[in-house]
Amino acid sequence: MIKFAQALDQTDRSARHILLGNGFSQSWNHETFNYKYLFEKANFGVRDAVIKSIFQKFETYDFETVMFKMLASADVLESYRGDPTLIEQIRTDTEILKESLIQVITDCHPTLPSRVSDEEYEMARHFLYEFKKIFTLNYDLLMYWARNKSDIEPEAFKTDDGFRWPETWSAYREDVHQQVFFLHGALHLYDNGVSIKKHAYDEDAEVSIVSQVRMNLRNNKFPLFVSEPTHFKKSEKIKHNPYLDYCFRQLKQLNGDMFIFGHSFDESDKHIFDELKNSSVNRFYVSIYGNENSEHNLRTIANARTFLAPKDVVFFSAESTPIWRVA
């Protein structure tokens, strides 16, 4: 396993891209951006006791894993001609779980960009500056905040997210050269039924993006969010949204080298890796956190090689990667 700096030395910045997983956000604050914390803060309403007991039954805090098992149970019961009322309840509970995930992520998210220090933003901006195109699977705003901090070094780091005034996605305009892609949506993105919009800080009203999202949730208006439990269902949702579908298709257009940071290579995101495998990317650099011989990391390494085969895959140390702080 090599270090991050060595991986940079082996690649050319002009053809180097990155896919960010949850490890990017966890490297800023592990407590806020992990499933255990979200589970402890989640409230599933009148179904709270039942749904939480399912997490406990499977000994996991992973929302997507539980959703997958619930839907699989409903499918099995349906095949055995089980009680239709019970099957419908399981599927309803799955929707409650999905909506609760969006709610708890929003509730636990830092309200203001000032929660992140200027020093941390500068480190993150230097990290992101190393890549031509940035793809993320994260819903939170940390990367979005970092790229928008234009008054902080490096000043040359400027990216195009495809949105133009009035905060509308406009990727097909001639003056748009999108470089930032939220593959599974994000808290600040929403579909108003006509176009894809994004929340921006309202200076006049002094209303933060997170506050705007919370106000929308109170009115049952949800952000653009892909949290389906399987890669098949995620693909279905992506194909039915113009922004998500466009971002997804850009993966196949890539060439050069692709870094993948902070992802455990779960089966539920295989649609992403299938698209990357069919791209013209020469080599993948995949981060590994902790002991590379641990059971978890051995599974990650095996999945990365399997999902991206026959491409060349190189592994680098996540701890050697300076994102928010000096490594």
Segments (PLM) and residue ranges:
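Active-site metal-binding loops of divalent metal-dependent hydrolases
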Residues: N22-G23, Y139, G185-A186, H263-S264
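Extended, H/D-rich, highly charged conserved domains that either
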Residues: S53-R91, E120-Y121, R125-S235
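Short coil/turn segments at secondary-structure boundaries
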Residues: E31-T32, S195, F273
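Short secondary-structure boundary/capping segments
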Residues: E31-F39, N148-P154, A302
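Short, flexible loop segments at boundaries between secondary-structure elements
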Residues: R47-S53, R164-F181, N282-I301
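A Trp-anchored, charged/polar loop motif used as the substrate-binding/catalytic surface
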Residues: M1-A5, S114-E119, G162-W169, E236-R249
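Gly/serine-rich nucleotide phosphate-binding loop at the start of the catalytic core
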Residues: M1-K132, L137-D140
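SIR2/sirtuin-family catalytic core signature
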Residues: M1-I18, F24-W28, K234, D245-A327
